[in-house]
Amino acid sequence: MSGVELVENQINEPKENEILIKVKAASVNFPDLLMTQGKYQHKPDLPFGLGMEGAGIVLSVGSKVSKVKEGDEVTFGALGKGAFTELICVNENSVEIKPSNLTFEQAAAFQTAYLTAYVSLVRRGELKKGESLLVHGATGGVGMAAVQLGKYLGAKVIATGTSKEKLKETINWGADHTIQTHKENKVEFRNEVKELTGGLGADVIYDPVGGDVFDHSIRCINWGGRILIVGFASGRIPTLPINMALIKGFSVVGVRAGEFARKNPEKGVENNQEIRRICEEGFFDPYVCKTFLLSEAKESIKYLSERKLIGKVVVKVD
């Protein structure tokens, strides 16, 4: 991360479809770390800004903007532009009204994680009440969101992670059971999943981890189950022995929340409306384990790389 530094930039007035926002907080996400290493699928031209998303207050809007007005509290996406900043100008399509019951720090940690969980479990996984949901990487941001949404949808939620201590927090988020996946440098959880599901295996598996975790997941999935591919935090993209899908009748489903909205614009709008509604009804509670100042943004990414977080890490802008 030797190339990461704070610089001064000139912010222009918003164009006709743009919104100028005073940033109050920005979330630190795993893709931010990958982008500093040149490993993320989206590779903006150098130099680029870090911080995929944030929350703030609208200062002014372009002439054709009708979605928000000056003074509104909003969340926004900023991939490539960089939310680790005091002011930002973004297209109105990247902006949503902030859930009224969240702080700016919570709101900065909200949109990407909970939208990913919603598209995964509702749109792609079609999770039903009473089904069993296995959430890998449950102590991270997208895992936290999946645990809370799974509980809201009426599933039996099994949370997994590498740290027994950190997994305790997932019980507060709604997990019914927890499983430590890594013991003595060995991955093993499928027998515990089978025990917790009456020998059947999980109906839906939410996997932002990949690697060995995926390899073991295909051996504890129920007949007709759905494995949702959310990411590869382990660093290894696994391969699928296709005969396993034939024998066990399961589906492997890729999830890209942003692309889903681009391909299905109306449902994309509905997705954002639904996660905001559920949040304002009190069912979502983004957990922020640590905040950094804007001057400490580089340290926030280092903290993420050390796998210390529970829930989300946020950069606060004052």
Model-inferred region functions:
Residues 34, 76-137, 184:
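NAD(P)H dinucleotide-binding glycine-rich loop of Rossmann-like/cofactor-binding domains
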Residues 73, 132, 156, 225-226, ...:
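Short glycine-centered segments of the SAM/dcSAM-binding site in methyltransferase folds
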Residues 113-183:
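Mid-domain Rossmann-like dinucleotide-binding core that forms the NAD(H)/NADP(H) cofactor-binding site
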Residues 151-213, 266-270:
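Adenosine-nucleotide cofactor-binding segment
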Residues 161, 170, 212-284, 316-318:
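Glycine-rich phosphate-binding loop and adjacent beta-alpha segment
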Residues 277, 281-287, 298-318:
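C-terminal capping/lid region of NAD(P)-dependent oxidoreductase domains
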